[in-house]
Amino acid sequence: MQLTGDRFTSETASFGNDLSTLPNFPAEIRAPAGTLPGVSSFQLHFADHDILTPGDAPNVLVAMNPAALKANLADVPRGAEIIVNTDEFTKRPMAKVGYATSPLEDGSLEAYNVHPVPLTTLTIEALKEFGLSRKEAERSKNMFALGLLSWMYHRPTEGTEKFLRAKFAKKPEIAEANVTAFRAGWNFGETTEDFAVSYEVAPATKAFPTGTYRNISGNLALSYGLVAAGRQADLPLYLGSYPITPASDILHELSKHKNFGVRTFQAEDEIAGIGAALGAAFGGALAVTTTSGPGVALKSETIGLAVSLELPLLIVDIQRGGPSTGLPTKTEQADLLQAMYGRNGEAPVPIVAPKTPADCFDAALEAARIALVYRTPVFLLSDGYLANGSEPWRIPDVDELPDLRVQFASGPNHQQADGTEVFWPYKRDEQTLARPWAVPGTPGLEHRIGGIEKQDGTGNISYDPANHDFMVRTRQAKVDGVDVPDLEVDDPTDDSGRGAGTLVLGWGSTYGPITAAVRRVRRAGERIAQAHLRHLNPFPGNLGEVLARYDKVIVPEMNLGQLATLLRAKYLVDAQSHTQVSGMPFKAEQLAEVFKEAIND
C-alpha cells in the first residue's frame, strides 16, 4: 500500500499539483493481515493551490478489505467516494474486524457513494495470459487500484510504468504483469458505467515560485541537506549510525553518495554509532549520527562528551511515539526536553527543528552551520510525520547555499611569558567562543581530549573549582550566543492598524496544521497571529518581546506541553498548551475550533 501511495504521489507531483502526504503503517514487518492493527494506509491531499496538510477528511477511500474500511471510515465525510474490493468482504475477514453483517448490504454506508469493485477478480482475469499462480496475480491488485485512481484524476501514467519496469528489471514477467494490471485498472474506469465522473485538478502554477521541482520526503530532504552541508563545508561527511525506525532511511540514502565524499558506518549499537561519529569529528569530518528517542537515551553520555570536547557533531533525532519502544512508526514531538536536558551535568546543546518535509533540507544546513561555527554538538529534531511525509521541493541553485567552510588550526596560537609560542586547544574565538579545531597529525598541535574537565586555554586536566565554574558558564554562554534570526510573526492588522490579541506559537511539524487552522479562523472573520520556532535552543532574541505583545498565547504540541513549559519558565508567560499524543498529526479543523474558543473566551 505504501508503494501504491508513493506512485500516485509521484504522478501527482509530476503533474504539477501541490501536495502533502501521510503514510501510516504498523510497526511489524509483516503485520497480521486483515486486522485493524495491521492496516497500512497512505493519505494524499493535492490541489491546484498551496497545500499545508494531508487533509482532515479524505474525499475518496479505497478499502482493500474490511479492516481498511472499518479503520478509516470515521475520517470519511458523508457523500465521499468509497471504492471497495468486494472480493475480500467474505464472512471470515468481516468477522475478524467485528462486522456481524456485510456493511455493503446492511445500509450502514448509505451516506456514501460506494463503488463495489471486485479488484482481486479483475486483476486475476487481466493477468491470466501470464501463467501466474492466483497468489502471484493477486499481488498486482494494488496496481489495478492505482490505475483506476489514475483514470479518476487524469494522472500521467508514463512514470509509473517506467518505475515498474525498473523495479522488476530482473523479473521482466512480473514487471509486465504489474504494468498490465495498472493499465487494466485505467481501462476499467474508462469503460465501466459505475464511474460516471472523473476529476480534473489543474497544476498549482500560482503556488510555486519559478524553478525546478521534485517530490521529496523529509528523510530524503534531510539526507540531501547533509550531503550539501559536507560539500559547502569542503569536508568529508561521516555518518555513524545504528538502524532505528523512523531514521533508517537516512543511513540507506547517504550510503549511496560515496562520490560526494560521504562515509557511512552501520554500527553494532547506538553507542558505537555516536562514538564513531565523534571520533570522525575529532579527525576533521562533518560528523552525524541519526536515531530516534530510545537511541538518544543511549547516546546521552557521548553527547555530553561532545559538549566537553567542544567538537561539531550533528545528532539527528527523528521523533516517534514513546516512552521506551513506544510506537515506532507513529509520530510525536516528545523529545524536546530530552534534547534540552537529557544529559548529566550542565551540557547545553543548540536545537533546530524543521517545519515541513522540504524544510528538512534547509534545517540540515542550518544545524551544520551552528555546529561548525560554534564547535558544538547540535540536535536536529524532526519526527515521523515529516520523515515519511512528502511534498514538492524546489531544487536550489548551488549558488544559493551558504558557505560553510571552516579554518582548521595550523600552528601555535599563544605566546607564553618567556616568548615561547605554543598551541592552546581551548583558547577561544572572542566572538563565537569556539575553540580551535586541530586535526590529529598536524605537527605541534597535539593535545589531550577526554571527558574530564579541561583547564581553560591549555586544555590540561583540571579539578580546580574556579576553573570548572568558568568552563561551565563559558560553554553555556557559547550556546546562548549562537546567532539565530529574530522570530517573524504573521499578524495582519485591521483598518485601524490594530493587531491580534491571540498568538499561536508552534514548532516543528505542527506548522502545516497550525497554518491551515489559522487561515480558517481568519476566513471566519477573526484576528489571530501566528509564529513558528525553528530554533529551540537558544530561542530567538526577540521571543520574549513577541510573547509580551499578546493577551493570549496558544502552543499546540504533539506532547504534553514541553515547549509551553519552557516558555513559562523563561518568559513567565501564561502560555495555553493544547496537546495531542495520538501518534497522528493535528487536524486543522480541530485546531481551528480551539483557536476560535480561545479568541472568544
Give the positions of each predicted feature.
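Flexible, low-complexity linker and terminal segments
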Residues: 208, 215-225, 233, 363, ...
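Active-site cofactor/cluster-binding pocket
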Residues: 1-233
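Short, solvent-exposed amphipathic alpha-helical segments in soluble enzyme
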Residues: 7-11, 77-79, 98-102, 253-259, ...
